[in-house]
Amino acid sequence: MKKYLAIINPISGTGSKKSIPELLGQAYSSADGELFLTYTKAAGHAEELARRAAEEGFEEVIAVGGDGTVNEVARALLGTNTALGIVPKGSGNGLARSLGIAMNSEEAIRQLSTGRRICIDSCTMDGRPFFCTCGMGFDAAVSHAFAEASSRGPVTYF
């Protein structure tokens, strides 16, 4: 029996994630397998959860959150047979946008349930893989300030 894991970051982005478990449950109820849900508790937790899921032979790990959550999960799945699914719920959702994943949760989950898979490239900087963007100088300073900010949304960039 196939196993699927949704890793939900409860503090990513600005939108509510209350409907996500039900939407995922509906989409994966017809799948030949079982869906498990878990929530992150701190930075780095998604990577740990995803790594464990890959080791246990999960078919797919679904990152529900922003680029940080997606990067953590994707890093853990590198070199495994476990697929990465994305439900964008962050402030920027850069990787999801570049892959054509819907920003609407219901539509993104519908896209996941089609079973379509693609391979994506990764890059490594200072021994750390990443999947969407990399910046230096001012770009990196803005990214760092955003990561340290207590609020989320586009206004945080100003």
PLM feature spans:
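A residue-level signal for conserved active-site and pocket-lining positions in enzyme catalytic cores
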Residues: 9, 46, 67, 123, ...
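Glycine-rich beta-strand-to-loop/alpha-helix junction loops that act as flexible
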Residues: 10, 64-66, 87-89
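ATP/NTP phosphate-donor binding region
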Residues: 1-61
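Active-site-adjacent beta-strand anchor residues
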Residues: 36-39, 63, 85, 132
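Catalytic core of DAGKc-family lipid kinases
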Residues: 79-83, 87-158
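Short Gly/Thr/Asp-enriched flexible loops that form oxyanion-binding sites at enzyme active sites
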Residues: 69-82
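Structural signature of FAD isoalloxazine-binding scaffolds in flavoprotein oxidoreductases
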Residues: 64, 71, 113
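Short glycine-/acidic-enriched loop or helix-start segments at secondary-structure transitions
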Residues: 17, 72-74, 96-97, 141
